[in-house]
């Protein structure tokens, strides 16, 4: 599996790009331009290249920027260029995670079709105990594997879905009907098409 990493400048305080690069044998991108030779790092190319994007850990600030399109760093700019499934693994203090602003931003990301990997409960960096720690990397990999395995379960199948109102004849003159926008039918069709 070929991976590329994008790290925010503040993320370098937690893990060095050298460590990430050593783990994947690939360079780490943190700025729009390479500090070594001035080469431009194309967020668009990353968006076209990837099969999925995983943002782990996702801070409250990053989640807020993603939800509202604040493209002030390479990570969020890359996210905004993605045409593939995006998985977000929040990691923050329990009060920050539970805050209505954070929950609202997560709801916005869900409404965009992003997959939220719920944080685990346990001891946090603040030494408090509760929900907010990033899910274990092994669990995140399991979520990705399950997602991509599920994407193939309807391959080659033909499915008929009706959308809109239905009318059932009672007799030659009367019928029973229902009002329907067809939204559920379209949602089912989209879900089947993605699998």
What is each model feature region?
Residues 3-87, 94-182, 186-195:
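A cross-family phosphate/adenosyl-ligand binding-site feature
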């Amino acid at each position: 599996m070929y991976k590329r990493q994008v790290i925010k400048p503040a993320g370098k305080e937690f893990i060095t790009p050298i460590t990430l690069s050593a783990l994947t044998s690939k360079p780490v991108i943190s700025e729009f331009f390479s500090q070594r030779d001035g080469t431009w790092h194309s967020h668009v190319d990353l968006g076209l290249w990837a099969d999925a994007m995983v943002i782990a850990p996702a801070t409250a600030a990053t989640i807020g920027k993603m939800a509202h399109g604040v493209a002030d760093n390479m990570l969020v700019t890359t996210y905004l260029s993605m045409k593939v499934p995006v998985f977000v693994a929040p990691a923050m203090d329990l009060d920050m995670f539970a805050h209505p602003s954070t929950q609202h931003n997560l709801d916005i990301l869900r409404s965009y079709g992003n997959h939220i990997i719920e944080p685990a409960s346990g001891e946090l960096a603040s030494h408090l105990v509760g929900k907010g720690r990033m899910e274990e990397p092994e669990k995140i990999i399991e979520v990705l594997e399950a997602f991509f395995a599920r994407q193939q379960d309807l391959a080659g199948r033909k499915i008929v879905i009706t959308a809109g109102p239905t009318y059932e004849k009672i007799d030659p003159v009367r019928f029973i009907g229902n009002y329907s926008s067809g939204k559920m039918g379209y949602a089912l069709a989209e879900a089947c098409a993605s699998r």
